[in-house]
Amino acid sequence: MTSRTLRAMTVLTAAAALCSAAPTAYAAHTTTATTTATAAAAASSAQAADRRVPRIVTAWARAWNGSEPRALGALFTADGTYTDEAVAATFRGRKEISGWKARADSLIGNVHVTIRTTRSDGNRITVRSVYSGHLKGAPKPFAVPMTTVIDLDRHHCRIVSNKDHYSLATVLAQSGLPADWTPPTT
């Protein structure tokens, strides 16, 4: 059992024990046992739901892993934004976002995003993944943890905002490049 499941069962068990108006210890035990079994089933179901990756996230990873920059741009609303926090760059609209993907492909060989977990909350999805590739001209490839916060439109069909968070210092260190390295401008 995970600590999350144990914590949920402990809280529900304590709540059932405190709220129980059962006249005997046996009745209280029966209520607590039933509540614990129900809580365990609910926690297990919630964990199974967390393992399902939302369709838009699968499409997002497929677009990053593919070679067609417009596939990434097409996932966004017309005025959507893509922010790469590590390089302090924001792109607006499908054309700029597609251009960012094309630039990334020209600088990084074998760009790949591997989804580890997702967490949905309303129109927001937090994606934990591994961002990997090989900066062109670098002696070694990199693979760093990345967290992406994706905000969806009200229909959950398109991305309104995407913010990637990863360590550029770690990318450069793993790649064998100096900390002040900058990509070529052409």
Q: Regions from the language model: what does each represent?
A:
Residues 69-121:
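A solvent-exposed, acidic/Ser-Thr-rich amphipathic alpha-helical stretch
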Residues 60-63, 83, 134:
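Alpha-helix C-capping/helix-to-loop hinge sites
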